[in-house]
A protein has these predicted regions:
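Context-dependent free N-terminus signature
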Residues: 2-8
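Extended amphipathic alpha-helical regions
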Residues: 11, 16-264
Length: 264
């Protein structure tokens, strides 16, 4: 029962869906959350877990903003064509811009986080699934001439999505510290399926997907999107789909990979 209470309390703190203005509201901290970490003091633990929630919310805002900036430009297919440059780099113009993908790390994380990189999957998802839907009404398959801007905005979109997904290592670390005796047997056994079951929070994922739809709608109002023509608007289902079908599953994958190495 105590184990379940520890897990539930952390879940309530990290995975309670926020309204767009709830980041600045006072949160109820349960006593069990304060004693959850073996290594962090009371104040540090509270600040850290609250910081994780706030950072994730800001990352979500950044993703929506970057997609909006990218959407008016054309696909510019040739910026994704792989070439060999004069300095020997083999890849597309966008790959060159993002080859030094930034994985956000801080000392509080276990060194296992440094070896986790699923950027190739993020690349395939963004270029193959998201971008065609994002720009399909703005010349998909037809270059609008502004290749540099298209490539630069693809870079910032990719970086924002990558940071959000890889930041889930912080969520995994917080979950582990809250209930190490729950996670350690599965980690020692290298039981990937059990760890996946531990990190899954279906209700929170569904709530997050719904919240992204609300954030997108609020963003439209903030940007006075009602003044734009229909062809200049992003498909309203794109952002929720991005989260529900791709970002949330990839964040789970990162958490599992991190936890499998947590005791190394």
């Amino acid at each position: 029962m105590e184990k379940m209470l520890r897990m539930e309390s952390l879940t309530n703190m990290l995975f309670t869906s926020q309204t767009p203005n709830s980041r600045h509201q006072k949160r109820r901290i349960l006593p069990i959350q304060i004693s959850a970490s073996r290594e962090l003091g009371q104040k540090t633990w509270i600040e850290w877990t609250q910081g994780i929630r706030d950072t994730i919310s800001l990352q979500e805002d950044t993703i929506v903003n970057n997609l909006w900036l990218r959407s008016p430009l054309g696909y510019n297919a040739d910026i994704y064509a792989r070439k060999v440059s004069s300095d020997g780099f083999q890849g597309s113009s966008v790959e060159r811009l993002v080859r030094d993908f930034e994985n956000f790390k801080v000392k509080i994380l276990h060194p296992a986080s440094y070896s986790i990189n699923i950027n190739p999957q993020i690349w395939d998802m963004y270029i193959g699934k998201i971008l065609p839907r994002l720009v399909k009404k703005h010349g998909y398959g037809y270059g609008d001439g502004d290749k540099f801007m298209s490539a630069e905005l693809d870079k910032v979109c990719l970086l924002a999505i990558s940071r959000r997904i890889h930041y889930s290592t912080h969520v995994a670390e917080a979950s582990f510290r809250a209930a190490p005796d729950v996670y350690e047997p599965a980690i020692i056994a290298q039981d990937r399926a059990l760890i996946m079951d531990l990190v899954m929070h279906p209700a929170w994922e569904e709530a997050t997907t719904r919240m992204m739809k609300v954030k997108f709608r609020n963003f439209e109002e903030l940007r006075h999107w009602d003044e734009y023509s229909t062809d200049d608007k992003i498909d309203p289902s794109l952002v929720p789909d991005l989260y529900g079908r791709w970002i949330m599953p990839l964040t789970r994958q990162v958490q599992v990979e991190y936890l499998l190495k947590r005791l190394d």
